[in-house]
């Protein structure tokens, strides 16, 4: 099977790269094992929240300039501030075209409220998520009886520290009792599958309506809206106060929705989606990828003109830690890491951890190297890259988006030259 590009990994980076390549008229396939890290995320995307020295970033342009001085090997630093902002804006346009109407500005971060009621600087958020400063003084944090994925009293306690009048309440929906037989089934995603049924909308409205008459804003867990935000808009039009939603413990309704919107758009535009499959081997000839072998296709290889590695970091098994060191399991690419295991981590758990910055070594075009030699038609994007800390620096989603589009543009340019 021949393709212009085969992308190994179907997370945020892989999907955005595929969508951008389709804009250039290239035929793409994505090979993915299963759920991506988006399923376990908040659904919000960070661009740059803090510098390596811990300084918070509010002005993104100034932050990118400072980042280049502090971390010259960061994926952003390799591109330059203006290029990062341009690619981030293009990524936001792609996301919106896919149906993910996310709120945010590439020039200025905003503060979203977290499930614990604290604030986190971010780039893009779903319109349901409350953004600081809140537009209300009287707030009610509403939990769902029996839902362990969200603790209303913890969020309320944090918000009270910001001089807000915050109460808590709990709604009980007997229609959800079918899920209570097994506590592991009473999760936000399973609740959403029931509540998203239009026949159940009125039941949720009836439960929230008495609470809404006594406050200016309801904050509740995101336990509906798995496919779209239609129910949230329907409730907001009818309730006498604003309704906002907070992400829950994983799996996350907002994260799954974002992934599904991107995946459906990729397929709608003619992309080949290969779920439940896994790349087992990649054949390289004369420094280029010639064949990709997957588990499900056995002796039928995929033959791409270009290949993209978007396999993620440790969480997605894109990187594997062993006693001898860190390795990239598909091709055995060169990996940036510390010399000894003792340098992988810091003693204090909440300190920035060195292992977060491990990843494959690439050139400035994000082409990785194998035994010191660049693989000419292979690109590495997203969390598998080295040189950044997605947690401490708050840049995970941004690096995925920016590197994906940079690789896509580079591939499209080279593909045009080869025609």
From Swiss-Prot:
Pathway: Polyol metabolism; glycerol degradation via glycerol kinase pathway; glycerone phosphate from sn-glycerol 3-phosphate (anaerobic route): step 1/1
Gene Ontology process terms (BP): glycerol catabolic process
Cofactor: FMN
Entry membrane topology: Peripheral membrane protein
Chief location of this protein within or outside the cell: membrane
Intracellular or extracellular location(s): Cell inner membrane
Top-level taxon of the source organism: Bacteria
Family listed: Belongs to the anaerobic G-3-P dehydrogenase subunit B family.
NCBIfam families tied to this protein: glycerol3P_GlpB (TIGR03378), PRK05329.1-1 (NF003718), PRK05329.1-2 (NF003719), PRK05329.1-3 (NF003720), PRK05329.1-4 (NF003721)
Function, in words: Conversion of glycerol 3-phosphate to dihydroxyacetone. Uses fumarate or nitrate as electron acceptor.
The protein's name in its UniProt record: Anaerobic glycerol-3-phosphate dehydrogenase subunit B
């Amino acid at each position: 099977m021949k393709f212009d590009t085969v992308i190994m990994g179907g997370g945020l980076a892989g999907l955005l790269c595929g969508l951008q390549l389709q804009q250039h008229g290239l035929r793409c396939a994505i090979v993915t094992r299963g759920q991506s890290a988006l399923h376990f995320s908040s659904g919000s995307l960070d661009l740059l929240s803090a510098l390596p020295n811990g300084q918070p970033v509010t002005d993104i342009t100034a932050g990118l300039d400072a980042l280049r001085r502090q971390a010259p090997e960061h994926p952003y630093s390799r591109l330059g501030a203006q290029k990062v902002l341009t690619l981030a804006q293009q990524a936001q346009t792609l996301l919106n075209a896919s149906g993910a109407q996310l709120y945010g500005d590439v020039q200025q971060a905003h503060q979203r409220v977290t499930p614990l009621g604290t604030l986190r600087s971010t780039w893009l958020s779903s319109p349901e998520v409350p953004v600081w400063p809140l537009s209300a003084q009287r707030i009610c944090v509403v939990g769902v009886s029996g839902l362990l994925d969200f603790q209303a009293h913890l969020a309320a306690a944090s918000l009270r520290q910001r001089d807000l009048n915050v109460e808590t309440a709990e709604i009980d929906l007997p229609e959800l009792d079918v899920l209570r037989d097994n506590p592991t089934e009473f999760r936000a995603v399973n609740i959403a599958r029931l509540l998203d049924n239009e026949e159940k909308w009125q039941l949720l409205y009836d439960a929230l309506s008495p609470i809404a008459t006594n406050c200016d804003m309801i904050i509740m867990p995101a336990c509906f809206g798995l496919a779209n935000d239609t129910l949230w808009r329907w409730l907001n039009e009818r309730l006498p106060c604003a309704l906002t939603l907070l992400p829950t413990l994983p799996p996350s309704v907002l994260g799954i929705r974002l992934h599904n919107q991107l995946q459906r758009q990729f397929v709608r535009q003619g992309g080949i989606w290969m779920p439940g499959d896994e790349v087992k081997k990649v054949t390289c000839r004369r420094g280029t990828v010639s064949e990709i072998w997957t588990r499900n296709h056995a002796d039928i290889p995929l033959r791409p003109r270009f290949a993209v590695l978007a396999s993620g970091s440790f969480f997605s098994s894109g990187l594997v830690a062993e006693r001898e060191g860190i390795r990239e399991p598909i091709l055995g690419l060169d990996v940036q890491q510390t010399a000894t295991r003792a340098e992988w981590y810091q003693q204090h758990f909440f300190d920035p951890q060195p292992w977060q910055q491990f990843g494959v070594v690439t050139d400035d075009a994000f082409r990785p190297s194998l035994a010191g030699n660049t693989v000419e038609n292979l690109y590495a994007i997203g969390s598998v890259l080295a040189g950044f800390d997605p947690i401490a620096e708050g840049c995970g989603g941004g690096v995925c988006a920016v590197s994906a589009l940079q690789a896509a543009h580079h591939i499209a340019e080279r593909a045009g030259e080869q025609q």
